[in-house]
Structure formats: structure tokens, C-alpha cells
Amino acid sequence: MNTSGKISVSVLIPTRNEERNIGACLDAVAWAGEVIVFDSLSTDATIDIAGEKGAAIVSREFDNFSDHKNWALANIEFQHDWILIVDAD
């Protein structure tokens, strides 16, 4: 746990058009020291909602699950050693 009372874990949430789910998902991981929404070019309000909730946002076009996740792990500068990947729904 860090000085803010949050757990030293980075949460990565891959999304695409998850406006119905992203708010509740972000509320559920509010305990984490870092929350990143990894968006696949959503055309709905996913990014707006994530931004309002204080999540960091990284966007990248989706190619396939494996490459997308591996790209995130290799290219995003996470604040914590532990990374939890959570579906928005």
C-alpha cells in the first residue's frame, strides 16, 4: 500500500465501445494505485467516461488479443511492478 492508501498495483483495462460498463469497472478498481484504460479506438463515450473517472488513457488500434496485450506490456510505462488486466465487462 502506498501513502495514498491505495494498493501498489497497476490495472490495465482493454476497451472498445464499453460506455455501458466502464464506469462500474473503474469504480470496482478504485483501490488500485494506477488505472489505465487501453482503448481500441472506441466510437462511443468510453474514453470520456474513463477520463472523468480519472483513469489514464492509452489508445491503439486492435489487431488481435495476444499482440494487443503484449504491446501494452512492452510499451506502457506502468508505475507498479504488479499488473492486473481486467475486462471492462
Regions found by a protein language model. Name each.
Residues 23, 44-53:
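Acidic helix N-cap motif at the loop->helix transition within catalytic regions
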Residues 28, 39-48:
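A conserved acidic beta->alpha catalytic loop
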Residues 61-68:
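A short, glycine-/small-residue-rich helix N-cap motif at loop->alpha-helix starts
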Residues 8, 33-34:
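Residues at the starts of beta-strands that form the adenosine-phosphate
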Residues 70-82:
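Active-site nucleotide-sugar/metal-binding loop of Leloir-type enzymes
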Residues 1-28:
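N-proximal low-complexity "stem/linker" segments adjacent to membrane-targeting elements
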